[in-house]
């Protein structure tokens, strides 16, 4: 598997009033393997493994200095396992097939992407920290599948609750001064996702999430996507 990513960010310091813009672009390539049973009711155990090599170009543009550029690269790998329980199956009066499932999950991810050390516009050495972090996750997902057997279209809404633990803090060493993001070593997440099979080869999906940890840390996001099968 492979992919391309592009991200733009903007941060502002409430203490000194300065802003900074950032851009990241790059690629990933790797492989994955999945085990699951082929029961038509989609229940039972599963296991998922993937390994990726990632390479990015990072740019930072502070409001009070010139643009800085550096690279980040490394390997990331994940092992996930879980079990899906069938809660209820039925066919409605209109002929729509309904299936409700509960899936318990556990995952371990090693984050090996490391940012290159670089010199900023003021001639200070900057080095990111946190590479080699091992993130563990335990979670539960409940979903309901609506399938129209006549058209083949399907809709699947999900609700997921996760708990994450990191072994390292993510931060920066700036001219020998260390700082890191607080509140992210342990945090919870609630996520809502909906998938729709609009045709034989096209799937659309959207998701929204909210994360919260200690020290008033929080993060919210929304995503949309499409999958085309050839």
Where do the protein language model's features map onto the residues?
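Membrane translocator/pore-forming domains, dominated by Gram-negative outer-membrane beta-barrels
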Residues: 1-230
């Amino acid at each position: 598997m492979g992919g391309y990513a592009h991200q733009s960010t903007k941060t502002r310091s409430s203490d000194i009033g300065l802003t900074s813009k950032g851009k990241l672009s790059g690629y990933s390539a790797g492989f994955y393997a999945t085990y699951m049973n082929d029961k038509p009711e989609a229940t039972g155990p599963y296991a998922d493994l993937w390994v990726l090599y990632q390479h990015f170009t990072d740019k930072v543009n502070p409001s009070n200095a010139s643009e800085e550029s550096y690279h980040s690269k490394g390997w990331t790998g994940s092992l996930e396992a879980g079990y899906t329980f069938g809660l209820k199956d039925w066919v409605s009066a209109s002929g729509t097939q309904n299936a409700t499932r509960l899936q318990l999950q556990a995952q371990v991810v090693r984050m090996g992407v490391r940012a290159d050390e670089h010199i900023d516009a003021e001639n200070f050495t900057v080095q990111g920290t946190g590479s080699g972090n091992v993130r563990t996750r335990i979670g539960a997902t409940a979903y309901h599948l609506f399938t129209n057997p006549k058209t083949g279209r399907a809709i699947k809404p999900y609700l997921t609750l996760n708990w994450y633990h990191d072994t390292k803090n993510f931060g920066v060493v700036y001219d020998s001064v260390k700082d890191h993001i607080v509140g992210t070593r342990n945090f919870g997440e609630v996520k809502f996702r909906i998938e729709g099979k609009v045709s034989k080869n096209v799937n659309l999906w959207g998701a929204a999430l909210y994360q919260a940890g200690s020290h008033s840390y929080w993060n919210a996001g929304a995503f949309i996507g499409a999958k085309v099968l050839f």
